[in-house]
């Protein structure tokens, strides 16, 4: 434990907070190219085939990004926009693809939470 005199001379050193989305370079979104599209199984209590894409960002970082929603049209060499946001039951997947932007289409006929999935407003009768 430091003495009062030592604290006056040097002060305390602040802990550095780690950046969880370092690949984004402090940007809200980044563009990237799909290198591979695949599925992965989630951690223990859950069971599914979650769709993920390996993406090379414009700053040359290679990351895994989750593809939200039911069904997608992504394939190799597709251009996608990436945002932060991890997937709790997929270790190592810390990013999301944004639907309805670039080559990743929105979900047709989606009625609820449309803004999150790039869906058009349904025609009212």
Curated annotation (Swiss-Prot):
Main location (coarse class): mitochondrion
UniProt-listed Pfam families: Ribosom_S12_S23 (PF00164)
GO biological process, one term: translation
Cited InterPro entries: NA-bd_OB-fold, Ribosomal_uS12, Ribosomal_uS12_bac
Cellular compartments annotated: Mitochondrion
Keywords of the record: Mitochondrion, Ribonucleoprotein, Ribosomal protein
Family matches, as PROSITE patterns: RIBOSOMAL_S12
Superkingdom, natural source: Eukaryota
Gene3D superfamilies: Nucleic acid-binding proteins (2.40.50.140)
MF term (GO), any: structural constituent of ribosome
Recorded family membership: Belongs to the universal ribosomal protein uS12 family.
NCBIfam families, per database record: rpsL_bact (TIGR00981)
Protein name listed in UniProt: Small ribosomal subunit protein uS12m
Species this protein is from: Helianthus annuus (Common sunflower)
Organism classification: Eukaryota, Viridiplantae, Streptophyta, Embryophyta, Tracheophyta
Gene: RPS12
């Amino acid at each position: 434990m430091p003495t009062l005199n030592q604290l006056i001379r040097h002060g305390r050193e602040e802990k550095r907070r780690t950046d969880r989305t370092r690949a984004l370079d402090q940007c809200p979104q980044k563009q990237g190219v799909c290198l591979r599209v695949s599925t992965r199984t989630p951690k223990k209590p859950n069971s599914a085939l979650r769709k993920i894409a390996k993406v090379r960002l414009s700053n040359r970082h290679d990351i895994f990004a989750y593809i939200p929603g039911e069904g997608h049209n992504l394939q190799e060499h597709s251009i996608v926009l990436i945002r932060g946001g991890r997937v709790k039951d997929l270790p190592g997947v810390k990013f999301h693809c944004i639907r309805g932007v670039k080559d990743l289409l929105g979900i047709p006929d989606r009625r609820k939470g449309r803004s999150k999935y790039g869906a058009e407003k349904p025609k009212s009768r």
